[in-house]
Amino acid sequence: MLMLLSPSKTLDYETPATTDSFSIPEFLEKSSELVKVLKQKSFLDLMELMQVSQKIAELNVERFNQWKLPFSTENAKQAVLAFKGDVYTGLDASALSENRLTYTQSHLRILSGLYGLLRPLDLMQPYRLEMGLKLKTKKSENLYQFWGEKITDKLNVLLAKQDNPVLINLSSNEYFKSVQKKNLDGRLITPEFKELKNGKYKMISFFAKKARGLMVRFAIDHNIQKAEVLQNFDYDGYHFNLELSQVDKWVFSRG
């Protein structure tokens, strides 16, 4: 079983890492190609490309200009500890023991516009580059074209090592478009999280994001190896809703 998350825009490079263990991203050569393009952009270019404020654009001009190889614990941080959005609030990786971080390294991957596919302990330098951006390079019109088959091929290598290859998609639509799901060599399961509001079950983005992280944490806490066991997920009042679920679309609801 392999779980897949989106990254977050919010980053934390102030809090010291809670582990000395780390790995190096596998697509750094491709990341370097993107950074080379991004270093040529002004803050005005980034404001238009990313649709962000001048302050955020200037911050990312600085980030891309400071981005350099090789990565070390002096100039980079483990991805699962650096990301700090709603998903990662639910995951709360800084509270994980070394053994549990080892589990994440085998069972979790994080999609990234800049790094392609990250292991949780992969070192990364700070950036902002959403997968849906139309960043042009010499050979591609956008990041989906840039990454092409690479992310899917890597996921297939990982799935091939499993007895029952299953990918649990806990990423957003924007990021999962970078995966060519028709070419996946395994079963694809997409959990959804819904709240009961005015007599109807609805997906509310803030709660759903946190729940994705909570599901990963549930898998870590219970050392889950088989996807079906995730149907026991019960953190924060959620439960598996058989009535709303389909074969490969599992709905968890509360309220």
Regions found by a protein language model. Name each.
Residues 93-246, 251-255:
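Internal, well-folded beta-alpha domain core
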Residues 4-95:
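Active-site helix-to-loop segments that bind/position phosphate- or nucleotide-bearing substrates
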